[in-house]
Structure formats: structure tokens, C-alpha cells
A protein has these predicted regions:
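Active-site rim helix/loop that mediates acceptor-substrate recognition in acyltransferases
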Residues: 20-42
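Acyl-donor binding region in acyl/amide transferases
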Residues: 61-110
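Short amphipathic alpha-helix that is part of the acyltransferase structural core
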Residues: 1-27
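Short glycine/proline-enriched coil/turn segments at helix->beta-strand junctions
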Residues: 45-49, 89-92, 113-115
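Conserved catalytic-core motifs of GNAT/GCN5-like acyltransferases
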Residues: 98, 113-123
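Conserved donor-binding loop and adjoining core beta-sheet/short helix segment
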Residues: 37-74
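Short glycine-aromatic motifs
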Residues: 41, 109-113
Length: 123
């Protein structure tokens, strides 16, 4: 029997909360749960990891954006092809990831490349 979305969220909660530690305070656990339930975010659970994505509409492009990922790195990398297929099916022009620098090295062989650096400053 397939687990419900709530059961999967609870199973993945520690990974999501660990990833939220690097978000700069932009989201809390409750924001993620609400966003997944409202279909604003997409939830990608795996056996030993998970990711949370959103589709962002810019004036000239539609981007599939991975903004949270946690668990075993191999599990996250293994989602690349299915995530790309999903993004294409949604009419996305590209994919982006917000994460720590190590992701650039890990995903290089999957066709990813650094495109810019984001800096942050608390006010």
C-alpha cells in the first residue's frame, strides 16, 4: 500500500528541516507542508532522501527550481532524469538549484553548470 503524502512528509521531515537550516530563514516546515498541499511546490520523496521543487515563471522563461534537498546525495542525484522529464512536461525551459557549493561538483556529470553566484545580507 502506498504511503500518503502526509506519511511521506513525516518520514522525510528530518531531511527537509536539515535543508531548511541553509535556506536563510526563507521557509519553515509549515510553509513547506502548506506549499506541497496547495500544489505550489512539488515533493520528491525517495527511500533515503527527498527534494522540494517549484516552478518559477519569469518574464522570458519558465524554470523548474530545486530549493530543498536532503538525505543521501546519490538519492538526490538519481532524481535528475525524472525531474527533468517532469519539468519538460510542464513546459519548463530549464532547471535551477539553490544549494551549497558542493552540488556544482556533484551534478557536473549530470549536465549542470554554475551560472551565477547568489549573495545574501541580513537587514
Amino acid at each position: 500500500m502506498a504511503a500518503s503524502i502526509n506519511e511521506e512528509l513525516e518520514r522525510c521531515k528530518d531531511w527537509i528541516e536539515a535543508a531548511l537550516e541553509y535556506s536563510g530563514g526563507t521557509h519553515e516546515w509549515s510553509d513547506i507542508v502548506e506549499g506541497i498541499h496547495s500544489l505550489r511546490y512539488q515533493f520528491w520523496p525517495a527511500e533515503k532522501g527527498c527534494a522540494v521543487t517549484e516552478i518559477i515563471m519569469f518574464p522570458n522563461k519558465k524554470i523548474f527550481h530545486v530549493f530543498l534537498a536532503g538525505g543521501e546525495m546519490d538519492q538526490i542525484v538519481d532524481m535528475n532524469d525524472s525531474a527533468a522529464q517532469f519539468a519538460k512536461a510542464q513546459g519548463c525551459d530549464g532547471m535551477s538549484i539553490a544549494g551549497r557549493k558542493g552540488w556544482a561538483r556533484v551534478l557536473k556529470n549530470e549536465g549542470w553548470a554554475e551560472s551565477f553566484t547568489t549573495l545574501a545580507k541580513e537587514l
